[in-house]
């Protein structure tokens, strides 16, 4: 059955889980994390469903792709190139303020982009029996977090690469091939060895920041203890059903 039929709506942010929509859950978590200004980028249907919060909320209609949405949010907030901002997906049903705080506090002031990774062991412990996909690295198995910290200047400077990565984001293999093409000038020395290590699970996450600095001029920081709540998103009806049951069994996540 299509996800929209199971969830009762075609707009993810308006999926209802245990009495609250996804957009309401995420916005409350952002406020609990101390975020004072929030740009919501999405369907106009979301505009009429925004909860009343103490935080200042701004709205922008969604663009053609996720990167366009980031640009619209940054523009709506009026952020300068040197500013860092927190990006958070809307389909995080178990999101908490503390999970976001951990990510925010882990972001070095000089980082251009902070990417969160959740250890598989922590995810499975919190969400036993949940559907998920983990990637294997030299440091172990991890899930990607659906929240990140980014500098506006990095977003502006890396638009072509970020658009290609956004288009490939649902497939680890496609992401790897996208990066391989991006490093074509260093194919023999960096691209091919990097891809080989990735596909065999031998790639060390710790090796990526120096590569990003050398090839992109970007300061990449990897946070390898991102909370499981940041890694559970909803892409399938199975994801939705599990989240609904999990929230019903954990009353402290009730808004």
Go through the PLM ranges and name each one.
Residues 1-45:
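N-terminal glycine-rich phosphate-binding loop and ensuing alpha1 helix
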Residues 36-38, 84, 112:
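Residues at the starts of beta-strands that form the adenosine-phosphate
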Residues 41-44, 89, 117:
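Short beta-strand/turn micro-motifs composed of small residues
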Residues 51-86, 94-95:
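Short phosphate-binding loop-to-helix
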Residues 96-214, 225-229:
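Conserved core of the sugar-phosphate nucleotidyltransferase
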Residues 221-224, 233:
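Conserved active-site beta-strand element of glycosyltransferases/polysaccharide synthases
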Residues 236:
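Short, conserved phosphate/pyrophosphate- and ester-handling motifs at nucleotide-, phospho-/glycolipid
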Residues 240-246:
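Short amphipathic alpha-helices within nucleic acid-binding modules
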């Amino acid at each position: 059955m299509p996800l929209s039929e199971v969830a009762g709506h075609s707009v993810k942010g308006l999926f209802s889980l245990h009495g609250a929509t996804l957009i309401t859950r995420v916005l409350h978590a952002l406020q609990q994390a101390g975020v004072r200004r929030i740009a919501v980028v999405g369907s106009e249907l979301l505009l009429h469903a925004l909860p009343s919060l103490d935080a200042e909320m701004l709205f922008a209609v969604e663009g053609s792709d996720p990167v366009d949405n980031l640009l619209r949010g940054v523009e709506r907030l009026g952020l300068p190139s040197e500013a860092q901002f927190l990006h958070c997906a809307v389909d995080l049903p178990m999101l908490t303020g503390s999970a976001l705080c951990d990510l925010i506090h882990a972001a070095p002031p000089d980082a251009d982009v902070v990417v969160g990774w959740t250890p598989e062991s922590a995810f499975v412990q919190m969400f036993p029996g949940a559907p998920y996909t983990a990637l294997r690295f030299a440091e172990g198995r991890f899930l990607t977090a659906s929240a990140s910290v980014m500098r506006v200047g990095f977003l502006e400077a890396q638009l072509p690469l970020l658009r290609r990565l956004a288009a490939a984001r649902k497939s680890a293999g496609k992401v790897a091939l996208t990066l391989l093409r991006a490093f074509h000038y260093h194919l023999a020395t960096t691209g091919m060895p990097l891809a080989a290590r990735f596909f065999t699970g031998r790639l060390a996450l710790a090796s990526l920041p120096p590569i990003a600095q050398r090839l992109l001029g970007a300061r990449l920081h990897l946070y390898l203890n991102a909370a499981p709540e940041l890694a559970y998103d909803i892409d399938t009806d199975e994801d939705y059903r599990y989240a609904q049951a999990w929230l019903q069994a954990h009353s402290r996540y009730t808004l």
